[in-house]
Amino acid sequence: MLGRHRVVDHIVGHLAAIGTDHLFAVDGANIEDLYDAAHFRPELTAVLAKHEFSAAAMADGYSRSGAGLGVVAATSGGGSLNLVAGLGESLASRVPVLALVGQPAAALDGRGSFQDTSGANGSLDAGALFSAVSVFCRRVQTPDDIVSLLPQAISAARAGGPAVLLLPKDIQQARVGVGERNGHGAPGGRVAIAAQWRPPAGDPHPIAAQLRRVTGEIAIIAGEQVARDDARAELEELRALLGARVATVPDAKDVAGAPGPDGRTLGVTGVMGHRNVAEAGGGRPGGL
């Protein structure tokens, strides 16, 4: 059955269907339709930040913690520019974040509209700007484009880094035709698959078999990819198989817990890390 609803309804419905339960945003004239649509979705908590950088940092932290895809929304002009620092950090750390950036109505591109960032007629080019701090950046040109561009953006973000969709206000308000829906305002088949997405887990047993041949204690240094892929259970399985102790890099310090009396967790590596890590590596504190 064919139905029609607004582009913003499609966006929040799709996000809810893949398990996203928070949207971090600063409201504004050219993003208010999306924010209002999120407010009326019981599955989504729309968090109102005081500054766009704060909203971007919240989305980044949400993703780093393993809660799911971090989503941030901001209006056009200066509001969108305030996202750049936060998205730059997400890009540097390869953190999955989806940024939904409002734009003035496309019909006014290059005609002196307030906060025009279309790149037309000498205006600031948001596409060029956000392409520098993202792994994927597209401007939604027609309402029907959202059906393909939104899953593409989410897939690109999940591969590691921020993805940006530029949303002109008239496109946000326009109606989009969709097929049979799953109750979340999005095509059932596509979202059902996306909702089950999870990075493939590796088998720890071949690694364990190799390391059992070594002499002495075994220490594992867990990197930030463990946190990004939520591979905490696999890390613990490997640690238990080896009887090893675990240290972490700073961006993965939550994956193994705090150092305790059982000695299973050594702490964080680096010059600002824990003494136990350096001592386990046979070096001086701050040297590992």
Model-assigned labels for residue ranges:
Residues 1-288:
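N-terminal alpha/beta PP-like core and its mobile active-site loop of ThDP/TPP-dependent enzymes
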